[in-house]
Amino acid sequence: MENSYDSSKWSDSTTPYMVSWSLQSESSDSDWNRFNLGFSSSSFGGNFPADDCVGGIEKAESLSRSHRLAEKRRRDRINSHLTALRKLVPNSDKLDKAALLATVIEQVKELKQKAAESPIFQDLPTEADEVTVQPETISDFESNTNTIIFKASFCCEDQPEAISEIIRVLTKLQLETIQAEIISVGGRMRINFILKDSNCNETTNIAASAKALKQSLCSALNRITSSSTTTSSVCRIRSKRQRWFLSSHYSHNE
């Protein structure tokens, strides 16, 4: 009886635990089912996209690799340029990059200043349209006479009518050309010439003659500039957009 009692007592005492275990098991199953409902395979349209994840990782690694290679090439180019600069700058082996670049900038400024002061570059045409006239008197000791000359400079855009306009001015003023020099660079031109006025003598007002010559050359420059402006405006109208605009404008007016 004691054994029977103990057995029954054990079974009775363990009954709640058995029931409790079964409830926990059911609860765990329901929680797992809810977890599966939240992340079911149908929500992904099939199996979990492991291939897509692998492909994304490979793509990211490829982009990172290409970025590292591009950065390496950029550093190599910079280092090669710095090496070339070190060869041009004396005693630059111990200079860091910032000091090297500062030294190069200073040398470039010095070279630019020397080039601007060189007489070779002073005769080059400038961006501004200008006319200069400088009268000079040359004495001839043998004949005991003075000759008046004009050193003139004419700078403008390189236009075909510039020469003809200058020739017209010189012919009108009866000036003799002793020397002429034409320099054309980058669509600009400068004409330096030395002129002689055979009609001038010691009683001639040199300043008035120089002023008249400069005024005539300035008038010629204005004609050349206006002609250049008209030509450039005609060339601009030849663009496709403006041709379309003008044609549509005229068609509406008609």
Curated annotation (Swiss-Prot):
The keyword rRNA processing does not apply. Expressed constitutively in roots, stems, and flowers. GO terms for biological process: regulation of DNA-templated transcription. Induction: Repressed by salicylic acid (SA) treatment. Gene3D superfamilies: Helix-loop-helix DNA-binding domain. Residues 62-111 form the bHLH domain. Its main location: nucleus. Keywords: DNA-binding, Nucleus, Transcription, Transcription regulation. It holds the Pfam family HLH. The keyword Amino-acid biosynthesis does not apply. GO terms for molecular function: DNA binding; DNA-binding transcription factor activity; protein dimerization activity. This is Transcription factor bHLH51. It comes from Arabidopsis thaliana (Mouse-ear cress). The lineage of its organism: Eukaryota, Viridiplantae, Streptophyta, Embryophyta, Tracheophyta. The gene is BHLH51.
